[in-house]
Every structure is written in C-alpha cells, then in structure tokens.
Amino acid sequence: MTGAETFGAISVVPPLLAIVLAIVTRRAILSLFLGIWSGGIIFTGSIGIIQTLNWTVSSLGESLFNAKILTIVMFLGGGVAMIWRLGGAKAIGNAATSRLDSQRKVGLATWIFGMLWFFGDYSNTAIVGTTMRDMADEMRMSREKLSYIIDSTAAPVATFGISSWVVYQLSMIEQGYEAAGISGQAPEAFSLFLQSIPFNMYCLFAIVMVGIIIITQRDFGEMLDAEHRSWKHGKVLRDNAVPMQSAEDSLGEMATDSPQLRYFLLPVGSLITVVFAGSAYTGIAAAGENPALIDIVGNAAFVDALLWGSFSMVAMGLISGVTGGLMDLEEAMETIIDGFSMMITAASILVMAWTIGTVTTELGTGIYVTNVAETIISPMLLPVVILFASAVIAFSTGTSWGTMAIVTPIAIPLAWSIGGSAPTLLPVAVGTVFSGAIFGDHCSPISDTTILSSTFTGADHIDHVRTQMYYAVTVILVASVMLLVWGATRITPLVLLPIGVGLLYGLVYGLSEWDASRKNLAPQAARTEQQSSPSDD
C-alpha cells in the first residue's frame, strides 16, 4: 500500500498549510514548522512532535546531498562576505557605474550576467545578486525586482547549460525509461533531452519575460507597486520589510577606501576555475578511456565541483585579503564566520523546506496529485496535464528536483503508452515536467532557489514571492496555450515559440496599462532613461 493510498487527499494539507501561512503571516520558518508538525500529526495520528523532530534531524543527518548543499551555502556566504569586506563588489559597481547609468541598463546587465552564469543556480544567485545589488539600489530598482531578475535567470538558465541540473535531468529520463521498460527502444537520454528543450516552454518564456519587462520598463501586479515605491520615494524595500540579509549590518564597513577589482576577480575566478576543472576531472574519471564530451558532462559531479569551488572562493578571498594587507588573519576569519552567520536564516529555511519535502514523500502527496491528474489525460491534454501536475507538486513541496523524481517516472510511461508505444510524445512529456517543476519552484515560498534569491539580493522573502508570482503565472499561461495548440495541431514548437513571445509582449503591455490605470499610476512608474538618479517628490 502506497502513502497516497493510505493518506489520500489529506496528504496535501501540510504543504498547503505551510504555503498559506507563509504568505499570510510572512514568517517562513514558523509557517514551515507548523506545516511539518501537521504532517507529523497526520502520519502518527497523535500529537506528532517526536516524528516532526525526527524528520527535521533526518534532513540534516541522513542526506549527504543536503549536507553538501548546506556547506556550499555557508561557503558562498563566507566568500561573499570576504568579497564585500575587501571592496570587490564595490569595485565592480564603480567600474560599471559610468556605463550602467539607468535602471534599464542595470536590469539588462543583471539579465545578461545571469544568463552567462549558466553552470549553477546557487552560485548564480550568490554572485549575480551580491554584485548587482548596490547598483540596483543606486538606480532605485526595488529589491523585489532585482530578486525576480535573479530568480528567473538562475534555475531556468541552468536547465539548458552545462550544469548539475542537466545531469540530474538525464538521470530522471533514464529512470523514466526503466519505469516504462523501454530502455532499448527510445532515444538516448541526451538526445531526448535536446529534443525536449523546445517544449520546456516555461523556462524559455521566463527568460524572455525578464528581457521584456526590463526593456519595456513595464510592470503590473504587486511589482508595479514595489517599483513605484522605489522609484518615487527611494524605498527599495517596503516599510516594515524584513530583508533576508544585510551585508552592512552583518559584516560592518569595508576594509578599504580604495576598492580594487582584483578582490572580486580572484575569488570569483577561483570559484569558476575550480568548478569547471572539478566537473571535467570527475566527468573524465567516471567516463572511462577516450570519453566524448557528452559522456564527460553526463558523468561529472557538479555538486562536488561546486563544493570545491565555493571553498576555493573563501580560501582565495582570505589569502588575497591577508597578503594584500587589508586585514590580518584573525579579522579575515571573523569576516568568514560573519558570512556564515549571514546565511543562518537561509540555511534554516532550507532545512525546513527539505523536511516538509520528506513529509510530502511519507504522506504520498506527489503521487496522490499525479494520480488525480492521470484521470483526465488524453493525447491533446497530455502536455498541459503533466505541466500542471508538476507545477502543483513543486509548489506544494518547494523542490523542483523532487518533483522531477516523482513525475518523470510516471510521465514517460504515460507518454509512451498514449503515443502508441512510439517516442513521439516523449520530448513533450520531459519538457513539460521540467517546466512545471520550475514554475512551481518559482511560486513556492518554501523553494530553496527562491529563498536564496531573496537572500543574496537582500529582499523580504515573502515580498519576492508575491511580486514574482504575477509574472510566473503570466508565463505559465502563455506556455499552456502554446502547448494546447501543439497538442491539437502538432505544429512544430519552433513556430509556436515566437508566437508565444509575441503573446507575452502583448500581455505585458496590456496588463501594465490596465493595472497602472486602475491604480492611477504611470505604467512605467514615472521612470525615464534620461534620469540616472531620480529626485524625491
């Protein structure tokens, strides 16, 4: 008997309770804990507190992967702290200030930087968020807007680049083949992954949506309110907001009055070099003699490489700061520890998010939701059903990887069966699993990547979730329409994707005009490219 058969519809209570409480109370850790506790009550049929604590401890002690991620997060915090105290982030800002003299240019630079940093979503949010925050503040871009740009060019970009995401996706495809019993009859996993890219429409449209929002400078929903507040009154955070971190408060003043680029380039260069070298080394070692590039990528230990790289960033920051005479060893170590401390809130939420993921696994939440979705599947509806089943599971559990693990072994056999034991529907099944998982991840306040986006941009976490949700929902609706058209007509997605981009642009224009008129605000929040530093009203 599976967890879904045992607990049924009540299995969705813990994640939904946590999500609703987080949105209403804006207290993510408390809300997550109460959601976990409700799961303990359901699971045990009693007060459930012992089960709740056991689940929480197991999230820390029984998963090597989770331990590595927590260590990476702490090292990234320490590395960012060293870069900030040594003036590296300020030096980047100073070097770019003469060129990035408008909010649009800062937004475009952040967008491009995020797309170039394609090999990891965690390091993407850490480096891009920290580097661009001061420039965004100077141009009066709201922290909510910066968090949105960072978040939507982290995981979506990582799904297409040389990253741990792609390796994980390939492993999920193999699991789907095994579940369907078609390993010798279907395309190679990497080939299917490439075929699925045009159907990963949420990620493609999410990246494009960021560009449309930045270039047109049009906003709607709660983001319009945030941008209007920031631009008109200089408040990059709303009154009473609780930002996830503040480098100034946590780390103190910079150790120099003359920031130099080397204090950014050396630690970050070390991170990049070690991550790429470590990935190549582990990939070659595991792939055997004379491996092809695909084999190297498929066998690379990207998480391990990121662990080594984040450590090297801390070490290089310490060495360059001490040898450069900006601080002694004791002060450097205190800075690193301050950086660790700065990540405690994010680490706490990550542990709670992983724990509620354990709860949903034990109660069978994902399997229950997927089984319900299966009852309405037809060839035409298959892409949209998989998309929204994945979205609901990811939103409820806060983990896109966990969602892929739950849905892919079900979606691939379904697509094979509905497609008449032919591979026709496999690419769309794989692409829509990934799309739905990342959409749910973007909208969930218990998602690790969403949490880290708030952390490294210094935004209020729930404010980030609430403002981003309007844009994510817009993107998923456009993706749904395009997938429905594909299901009905089988027109190539290479034709549908440009149409979807045009529809996105039209929606952004129309919604921004309507919302601004409704709120009696300028659709562009009174921003003008001629003003590099707006005056207060």
Name the predicted role of every residue range.
Residues T2-G78, A91-R99, S270-V351, T365-I376, ...:
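Hydrophobic transmembrane alpha-helices of multi-pass solute/ion transporters
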Residues T2-T6, T44-E62, V167-F199, G211, ...:
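Inter-helical loop and helix-membrane interface segments of multi-pass membrane transporters/permeases
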Residues P14-V24, G35-I42, I72-A81, F113-W117, ...:
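Hydrophobic core segments of alpha-helical transmembrane domains in multi-pass membrane transport
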Residues I47-S147, L326-G420:
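Membrane-embedded alpha-helical segments and adjacent helix-loop junctions characteristic
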Residues I47-V57, S163-Y202, V210, N290-P291, ...:
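Transmembrane alpha-helical segments and their short flanking loops
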Residues W84, A158-G161, A179-A180, I344-I356, ...:
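C-terminal transmembrane helix pair
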Residues T97-A186, F190, S396-F439, T449-D463, ...:
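Hydrophobic transmembrane alpha-helices that form the pore/transport pathway of multi-pass ion
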Residues S191, A206-N299, F311, A315-E334, ...:
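Long, contiguous bundles of hydrophobic transmembrane helices that form the permeation core
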